[in-house]
Amino acid sequence: MKEAGQMQNLESARAGRSVSTQTGSMTGQIPRLSKVNLFTLLSLWMELFPAEAQRQKSQKNEEGKHGPLGDNEERTRVSTDKRQVKRTGLVVVKNMKIVGLHCSSEDLHAGQIALIKHGSRLKNCDLYFSRKPCSACLKMIVNAGVNRISYWPADPEISLLTEASSSEDAKLDAKAVERLKSNSRAHVCVLLQPLVCYMVQFVEETSYKCDFIQKITKTLPDANTDFYYECKQERIKEYEMLFLVSNEEMHKQILMTIGLENLCENPYFSNLRQNMKDLILLLATVASSVPNFKHFGFYRSNPEQINEIHNQSLPQEIARHCMVQARLLAYRTEDHKTGVGAVIWAEGKSRSCDGTGAMYFVGCGYNAFPVGSEYADFPHMDDKQKDREIRKFRYIIHAEQNALTFRCQEIKPEERSMIFVTKCPCDECVPLIKGAGIKQIYAGDVDVGKKKADISYMRFGELEGVSKFTWQLNPSGAYGLEQNEPERRENGVLRPVPQKEEQHQDKKLRLGIH
């Protein structure tokens, strides 16, 4: 047992050394999220990728196959199978760079989607799953020659918790997974690292101070300032129910079934559960920083041009989801003052097999110093330093620049491509974004039009040829219709909000949950 714990700690330490920073050796004055934990959190977050439209489409197809009533026995069997197979998020990593963000669809598991999307390019990749993959996925992934498979140590993809799993099929699948694991070259493991000291506190403080929350408080100064904390508590409850096993004995039983019996004894078990809870708290905190807040979202300031496909906004829940991806990336920053994250997605001409629908991942990045540099190679001072020669601004690579540099897909001019940035793009990045052919920018607008000592944000407001969607109240006047006929904008079209969504027990701000 002691050796097992030492091996786990050794594996965690190795992973920490290999992915601690972009530069490989730099340790800043602020806490940073390790790459292992970043990939883990992104896999959990991808499991939550909005799929309402896909479910509606599936329901219509189901009625088309079986008629309005359908074959009850067949529909019951399909429903039972789907309850047993848990939706799963997946992050594909190559050379410590993200090359794919995926989630399960109605028809395919996350691992199967990765095989379809990446094929033989999966060789030597690391895969981070939000649940332990099933044998059907694992056999193909292992066959592709992946390097390492990491998973979240709770209920696996073939659920061991649901009533549907009582047929023993889930246990048989777990045994098959263990046999595949034992006889493959790929390292199948749990990579969870304890968060660095003060990381949770730092994330809480910076999330509340981020552009999106501050825009709400400045726009509505009389509003209840507790809305952010109320939203966070709701998210924590939701994510703990989804990603944790509340009953400790049941959790131990699952761990033993999926081959992690070495983690069932203390202190390993208690440490594991604490690390999992800390990561869920961090995810809920970051997700709450881009809240599903009534009448706030990413809108064009001049919404009159919404006819062309490149000018149409994404559904708000998808835009928020992608912005939270960027917010998570920002906690890998090497800038002591301001963390910025950016993620690029594109939308194909038709829906694909992925749970993300027609959307596919292009690239991502955060602000950092050049790859391979050491901590003392470049200045780290901001504009408070009078000597301009030892300021950081001429040396740091911006998040948008890293996302463009390390993109894994080409940006196609005929498709709608979009970049999500946690802060307004500066004058250095705006022409790069336009020149790359990106059609849409989603960002905060707190700094628009400002000119600071070493960085300015003048070009964003003047940018033409790229649709800009900034975090703001719906400019079409939906907020003023609150007492009459509430509406919300989706894909550039105002749609009525169901009456039941309007009820909110004496709260000045209403927040929703994904």
UniProtKB/Swiss-Prot annotation:
Residue positions of the active site: E400 (proton donor)
Per the UniProt record, which EC number(s) apply here? 3.5.4.5
One GO term of the biological process aspect: DNA cytosine deamination
Ranges for domain CMP/dCMP-type deaminase: 70-168, 317-482
* Protein localization: Cytoplasm; Nucleus
Which residues are involved in binding Zn(2+) 2? H398, C426, C429
Transmembrane residue ranges: none
**Which segment of this protein is annotated as the motif Nuclear export signal?**
271-283
Q: Where is the composition biased (Basic and acidic residues)?
A: 59-83, 485-514
- Cellular-component GO terms for this entry: cytoplasm; nucleus
Q: What class of enzyme is it?
A: hydrolase
Give a brief account of the tissues where this protein occurs: Widely expressed. Expressed at high levels in the testis.
| PROSITE patterns for the chain | CYT_DCMP_DEAMINASES_1, CYT_DCMP_DEAMINASES_2
Disordered: region residues: 1-27, 55-83, 480-514
Q: Which InterPro entries match?
A: APOBEC/CMP_deaminase_Zn-bd, CMP_dCMP_dom, Cytidine_deaminase-like, dCMP_deaminase-rel, Deoxycytidylate_deaminase_dom
Q: Which reaction does it catalyse?
A: 2'-deoxycytidine + H2O + H(+) = 2'-deoxyuridine + NH4(+); cytidine + H2O + H(+) = uridine + NH4(+)
Cite a single GO MF annotation: importin-alpha family protein binding
Write out the function statement from the record. Answer: Catalyzes the deamination of cytidine and deoxycytidine into uridine and deoxyuridine, respectively. May play an important role in testicular development and spermatogenesis.
Q: Which family does it belong to?
A: Belongs to the cytidine and deoxycytidylate deaminase family.
Q: What is this protein called?
A: Cytidine and dCMP deaminase domain-containing protein 1
The scientific name of the source species is Homo sapiens (Human)
Q: Which gene encodes it?
A: CDADC1
